[in-house]
């Protein structure tokens, strides 16, 4: 079970999870029909940052469904930003892994999290091309309706790590140090894979299919659901900003970087590499500011 929260009952948490599941299912049905078909693709912040017509359509579906089901809510989406206000805040990524989606690679998902008074209490990550739905509320975490939990792997050399690192933004922020860091991690861990969806990386750690995951360039809509999933089974999610870690469940998902592990374990190389890169990027003045959602 996840940590109890006085501001949200288990019944309300379960209701929010059910609302998210229904919205995710409708979006997933739309997206799976669009997957591997010709589509309009544009660039948001540069040649590496894609958005498709289906990101926008998926977000419109989710915004309409979530806010109509829970009128007392705000919506924070990757494509359209924040709208509305209320006790509940929905953090939504309509397609996490847009590059994969646009090229026909099946590793992408829809991610939805519900926060009550800033505490994330429910979430859904739907990966229709993989036929997987990850869901969490205050009573626990499931994969396709069956209970699941992370595994605890003590030694780095035995651990399997998935991430989105290094990307172009990591090279822009940290230069050659990012490549050196990638080499250190590859040597230290049993296996490191770059798969292109932070939300699915967290879901895989929560399910026990990977032992750690991390990203140095993220937003709340990418990680809010997955962070709760990891913690639900006793794993750790550490937000990271300017070399300082944060495990507070009300703020960790708002930090611009993170790592997560499948148990209460310490991976010294991972901590040293990530805190160093996070700290140095801030010193160099090249990191993006911490995201805010007014």
Predicted features along the sequence, with ranges:
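N-terminal subdomain of lithium-sensitive/metallo-dependent phosphomonoesterases centered on the IMPase/IPPase/PAP
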Residues: 1-95, 281, 285-294
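Residue-level signal for inorganic ion chemistry
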Residues: 27, 31, 55, 66, ...
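Generic detector of well-ordered alpha-helical packing
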Residues: 56, 79, 94-97, 128, ...
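DPxDG-like acidic metal-binding loop motif
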Residues: 64, 85-139
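Short strand-turn-strand beta-turns centered on an Asx-Gly dipeptide
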Residues: 117, 143-147
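Short, isolated positions in well-ordered beta-strands
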Residues: 121, 147-150
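An extended, acidic
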Residues: 152-294
